[in-house]
UniProtKB/Swiss-Prot annotation:
The keyword Cell division does not apply. Part of the 30S ribosomal subunit. GO terms for biological process: translation. One of its GO terms (cellular component) is chloroplast. The lineage of its organism: Eukaryota, Viridiplantae, Streptophyta, Embryophyta, Tracheophyta. GO terms for molecular function: structural constituent of ribosome. NCBIfam families: S15_bact (TIGR00952). The gene is rps15. This is Small ribosomal subunit protein uS15c. Belongs to the universal ribosomal protein uS15 family.
Amino acid sequence: MIKNAFISFQEQKEESRGSVEFQVFSFTNKIRRLTSHLELHRKDYLSQRGLRKILGKRQRLLAYLSKKNRGRYKELINQLNIRELKTR
């Protein structure tokens, strides 16, 4: 059962690599990996810089998605358990 779900997810991933949702999903995975790395290696400043860059990219993509399609934006942030963007 799990293997079949993984295969279907892989097929979806191949089709939708350029979509905003997939990009946000992959950035979120990278952010979580870097965060766990930085908990162990606090003085790794290059990784901190990379984390800030990825956070900025994800923030810009989420802002774009919230302007274009608010429903998909809400659904995505609920799936990924991330907070909403701050409005100015």
